[in-house]
């Protein structure tokens, strides 16, 4: 625009009727805030990346992450500098407006000059006001020139303030096909894991898990049923499973039964106890040897109840519960408050090492020797002392106690030396 063609009334009116520099100052403050936030983000981002790849994370993955993240840190810093420059330029534009506003002739002076000129012209009958009229016109010309110069200068300053380098978008750190590739890799990894699990189960001997499934199927809760279904799906040979046993001095130990007992009970000690209960220890006639007598109850001087054999031919069916307290009326109490104390008759140390020449005392639990399973008879009653046992007691209960409320303690006596009467 050619401001020299416009009279001072127009230029001065435009300058004085505008919104002023307040909007430019507000924009400068906003850009300062953006620059500060970007600078803080760049410093924090760079610190996190450098700390992550230097201290806890090293290797090709860390190098790839650093290569993808470092350009973004640079972009944040560069954008922060651009925002700061934008704020400076907005502030410069506001200053340019202030300078132009101060140099512009006020519209009131222009109006006064025009009013005085009209008065002089109206009173100039004989030409006596010619000099005053010329001076007024000269003053008006100066106003015209001053406003034009101010507007030209303001135009140049505004153009310089608005010249900003363009903002660039951030560098693309990932490829467009990255999410699809990640999803495909995850799906492939899951399929590979399932295939590996199926291959591992297929290498097991045929029917290795049949005892587990048949034992748990009878009293399976919803969780156990779900696990059985998963096992059957992963390995179709489960249905024809055969037990795996380990030879021991007292017979063959079922590994699967031991595993089930160890994971199905809340105590490892009770798990081992309940697993070993089917292998009773006794004498084979006069041979003096030890061997399993599975399926026969212990012989003891006490009236031992017939056990309630579980699905393995050993421990009672396993059951477990979580979050259920014992009740005394309507009051929830710890389980130890309701445990009936066993009726202690006699308890001594285990018998010494068995000698083939020693006769078996009929009250000594078939002459069970000290050793790995010497105290297993007492330990097998640990669960019965707290849960009431899995079987029923033969005979009539005494002292008005119900069956299973106070299970007796098995009596273990020392084996007397040869020739001495039993104690």
From Swiss-Prot:
Gene3D superfamilies, sorted: PPE superfamily
GO BP term (any one): response to host immune response
Family per similarity comment: Belongs to the mycobacterial PPE family.
Positions of the UniProt region annotated as Disordered: 383-423
Coiled coil: none
Domain of life: Bacteria
Protein name: Uncharacterized PPE family protein PPE14
InterPro entries: PPE_C, PPE_dom, PPE_sf
Pfam family membership, one: PPE-SVP
């Amino acid at each position: 625009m050619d401001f020299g063609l416009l009279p001072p009334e127009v230029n001065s009116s435009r300058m004085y009727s505008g919104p002023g520099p307040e909007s430019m100052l507000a924009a400068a403050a906003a850009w300062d805030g953006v620059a500060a936030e970007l600078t803080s983000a760049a410093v924090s981002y760079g610190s996190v990346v450098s700390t992550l790849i230097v201290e806890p994370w090293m290797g090709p993955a860390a190098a790839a992450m650093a290569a993808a993240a470092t350009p973004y840190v640079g972009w944040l810093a560069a954008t922060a500098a651009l925002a700061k420059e934008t704020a400076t330029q907005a502030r410069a534009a506001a200053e340019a407006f202030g300078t132009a506003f101060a140099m512009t002739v006020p519209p009131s002076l222009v109006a006064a000059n025009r009013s005085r000129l009209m008065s002089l012209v109206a009173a100039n009958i004989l030409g006596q006001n010619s000099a005053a009229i010329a001076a007024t016109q000269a003053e008006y010309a100066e106003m015209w020139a001053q406003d034009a110069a101010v507007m030209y200068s303001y135009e140049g300053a505004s153009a310089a303030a608005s010249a900003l380098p363009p903002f660039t978008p951030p560098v693309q750190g990932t490829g467009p096909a990255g999410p699809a590739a990640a999803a495909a890799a995850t799906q492939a990894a899951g399929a590979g894991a399932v295939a590996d699990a199926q291959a591992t189960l297929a290498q097991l001997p045929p029917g290795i898990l049949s005892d587990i499934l048949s034992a748990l199927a009878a009293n399976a809760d919803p969780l156990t049923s779900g696990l059985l279904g998963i096992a059957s799906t992963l390995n179709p040979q489960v249905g024809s499973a055969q037990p795996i046993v380990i030879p021991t001095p007292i017979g063959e130990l079922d590994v699967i039964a031991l595993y089930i007992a160890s994971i199905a009970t809340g105590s490892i000690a009770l798990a081992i106890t309940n697993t070993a209960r089917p292998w009773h220890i006794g004498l084979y006639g006069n041979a003096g040897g030890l061997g399993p007598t599975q399926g026969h109850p212990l012989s003891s001087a006490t009236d031992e109840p017939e056990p309630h054999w579980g699905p393995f031919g050993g421990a009672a069916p396993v059951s477990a519960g979580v979050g259920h307290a014992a009740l005394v009326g309507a009051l929830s109490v710890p389980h130890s408050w309701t445990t009936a104390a066993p009726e202690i008759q006699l308890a001594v140390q285990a018998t010494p090492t068995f000698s083939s020449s020693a006769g078996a005392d009929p009250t000594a639990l078939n002459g069970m020797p000290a050793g790995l399973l010497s105290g297993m008879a007492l330990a097998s009653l640990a669960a019965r002392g707290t849960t009431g046992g899995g079987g029923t007691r033969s005979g009539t209960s005494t002292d008005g106690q119900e069956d299973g409320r106070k299970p007796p303690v098995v009596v273990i006596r020392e084996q007397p030396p040869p020739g001495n009467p039993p104690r």
